[in-house]
Swiss-Prot record:
It is found in: Cytoplasm; Nucleus. NCBIfam families: GlrX-like_plant (TIGR02189). Residues 31-139 form the Glutaredoxin domain. Disulfide bonds join C51-C54. One of its GO terms (biological process) is negative regulation of DNA-templated transcription. Disruption phenotype: No visible phenotype. Defection in sporogenous cell formation in adaxial anther lobes when associated with the disruption of GRXC7/ROXY1 leading to fertility defects. Has a glutathione-disulfide oxidoreductase activity in the presence of NADPH and glutathione reductase. Reduces low molecular weight disulfides and proteins. Involved in flower development. It comes from Arabidopsis thaliana (Mouse-ear cress). This is Glutaredoxin-C8. A motif (Responsive for interaction with TGA factors) lies at residues 137-140. InterPro entries: GlrX-like_pln_2, Glutaredoxin, Thioredoxin-like_sf.
Length: 140
């Protein structure tokens, strides 16, 4: 069986550059959009639909009984701008919007927890469940 080859070495997200160019999203507007999206649910995950680490973090939360709001940046017309702003928030200075390394990015209770390594470290050291309880994502 022949599998389709994924040619996305970089995160190009949406090939419709006309949509991207007409958005005129400035960094402050993008940050406000991220804040708004992060506040819509107790747990919010910024993800890419084809990313295995993003899939793993979604499985982790769903396995814990949490229903996160998931924003697949490769499916959003303004996903590149959101990704760039998330990279800035994480303190990533290299890679730009073509580096998927910072994804997934998780917000709990409207506050950024961080990328995969921070979430997994919190899970391992036992601080993730209290965060989820405080945010109202877990009741037990």
């Amino acid at each position: 069986m022949q599998y389709k080859t994924e040619t996305r070495g970089s995160l190009s997200y949406n090939n419709n550059s006309k949509v991207m160019n007409n958005m005129n999203v400035f960094p402050s507007e993008t940050l406000a959009k991220i804040e708004s999206m992060a506040a819509e649910n107790a747990v919010v995950i910024f993800s890419v639909s084809t990313c295995c680490m993003c899939h793993a973090i979604k499985r982790l939360f769903r396995g814990m009984g949490v229903s996160p709001a998931v924003h697949e940046l490769d499916l959003l017309p303004y996903g590149v701008e959101i990704h760039r702003a998330l990279l800035r928030l994480l303190g990533c200075s290299s890679g730009g919007a073509t580096s998927p390394g910072a994804l997934p990015v998780v917000f709990i209770g409207g506050k950024m927890v961080g990328a995969m390594e921070r979430v997994m470290a919190s899970h391992i050291n036992g601080s993730l469940v209290p965060l989820l309880k405080d945010a109202g994502a877990l009741w037990l």
